[in-house]
Amino acid sequence: RASFVLYPKDQGVYISARSLGEVNVQVIVEALGGGGNSTTAGGQLNVPDIAVARTALLRAIDEYFEK
């Protein structure tokens, strides 16, 4: 169980991720250029809008669970 928040700021979209420990959000957020640890992670995506960021996040989540 994990949650992800995307929000526009400055010249990109920020991501904040939290996990109860079952999902390593660090791995998912690192795939998007961010960082953190297994239960908390975040970063900035240099994308034009939230729709593009959402697509990238969903792709990273899919890749995480395919491993």
Where are these regions (language model features)?
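Gly/His-enriched, cation/cofactor- and phosphate-binding structural elements
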Residues: 1-67
